[in-house]
């Protein structure tokens, strides 16, 4: 038996990809702000070449999550998770938080020079 598709996996994938996309730039800044230093912080930029892949994966996952979350409630069977208004509202909130993370990942390299 397969579990019903409710968009949770796509939201998780989008959030994870957004975090990975900004890890190369945001990680060193956070560590420096917390007082950590050292030459090993430069090794965190090893993810930089993969940043476009992570951003692309995040955008694709967000597209599928958007399709699943913003479909009409009539498309859900009665008793399904997507038919409950509180769950739909929570998923929409999480979706927009993850979308904001992706926007931060997209814009962070352009804003980062102002912090260093």
Swiss-Prot record:
Locations listed in the record: Cell inner membrane
InterPro entries assigned: Transprt_MerT
Gene Ontology molecular-function annotations: mercury ion transmembrane transporter activity; metal ion binding
Topological type in the membrane: Multi-pass membrane protein
One matching Pfam family: MerT
The entry's keywords: Cell inner membrane, Cell membrane, Membrane, Mercuric resistance, Mercury, Metal-binding, Plasmid, Transmembrane, Transmembrane helix, Transport, Transposable element
Cellular component per GO, a single term: plasma membrane
Binding residues for Hg(2+): 24-25, 76, 82
Keyword Secreted: no
Domain of life: Bacteria
Transmembrane segments: 16-36, 46-66, 94-114
Function (record text): Involved in mercury resistance. Probably transfers a mercuric ion from the periplasmic Hg(2+)-binding protein MerP to the cytoplasmic mercuric reductase MerA.
Cross-referenced NCBIfam families: PRK13751.2
Family that this chain belongs to: Belongs to the MerT family.
This protein's name: Mercuric transport protein MerT
Species in which this protein is naturally found: Serratia marcescens
Classification lineage: Bacteria, Pseudomonadati, Pseudomonadota, Gammaproteobacteria, Enterobacterales
